[in-house]
Amino acid sequence: MYDINKVRADFPILSRTVYDRPLVYLDNAATTQKPLCVLDAMRDEYLNANANVHRGVHYLSQRATDLHEAARETVRRFINAPKTEEIIFTRGTTESINLVVSSFCEAFMSEGDEVIISAMEHHSNIVPWQLQAAKRGIALKVIPMDDSGKLDMEAYEKLFSEKTRIVSVAHVSNTLGTVNPVKEIVRIAHDHGVPVLIDGAQSTPHFAVDVQAMDCDFFAFSGHKIYGPTGIGVLYGKEEWLDRMPPYQGGGEMIESVSFEKTTFEKLPFKFEAGTPDYVATHGLAVALDYVTALGMDNIARHEHELTEYCMNRMAEIPDMRFFGTTEGKDAVVSFLVGNIHHLDMGTLLDRLGIAVRTGHHCAQPVMDRFGVPGVVRASFALYNTKDEIDTLVAGIKRVSQMF
């Protein structure tokens, strides 16, 4: 296990106060704070190696290109992808999913074809499919879940038909913390000859991800959820699928040759990377991945699992506490309501105590509909959080509860 005090010292923002109280940052499922090594690395590149990548023979361009492509290798190694050609840089998980949806549908789907998603998806894995449904006449089928937030795998198997073309599901629910059985989901889909896209935004920061062991066909995640910068994300895709999918956007860098008559496209991964990439952010992402690798993903998972269990046990002491997402082995998310206290009131009053939590539907309105509530309060944990902070949260909830 790592030294939590030493780790916290790596994150400058954790030492600040909010309303004259120490910051207790528990909104990590929305975005994580950044260690100084990431901030320093990005600043250093802007100061000493800022030039467009893949476009110049001069020193600065070559240096920036080297850092950018080294970041691609770092990502490949981190998720155990077979080839760097299968690592595509995007703006985030949302764009990664949209890339797959748009390009896959154009190549492989037509009117009447079906996609399977789950009842716990983030809007980013619902709306893009709905846009294609309106455009192409495809249909969405939804895997139901029980009251604990667990997917009904028997129902999942029954959703397949000769029209099923792809399965697209979250690895971990951003609202419930449910860790879905992705290996089984992939196996069942592959038994039907169907590829699988995994939304890894909420899994990648919390435990080791191995896309080869998972055998998924596509995997998406964001840099800012794993202590890296905003505006950078990753799409892993098996070469056999990416090769057959058309470009998502057109522009510079993704072309081989252009004339007024026709354009031919670059090989992977550049076919899907039109325009100037955020090459400083890719470097920042690589440094963030190296940071968590040095701490050990198993150590991070163990620490956050202890925090989650401790939080659930402490919060269970509070009268009229209602949890959303109670599956065994759930990830570092605790969503709740207390009595009739509105989630916005709870979040606003906790904020005045220096405690940052998320309130609302968490871009998962169908989940809220499933449980019959307009929104919930969500506390979500990271590698730098402590049991003392959870004690502060519990004390804050009790204090707010006494006001109603």
Model-derived features with residue positions:
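Pyridoxal 5′-phosphate
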Residues: 1-404
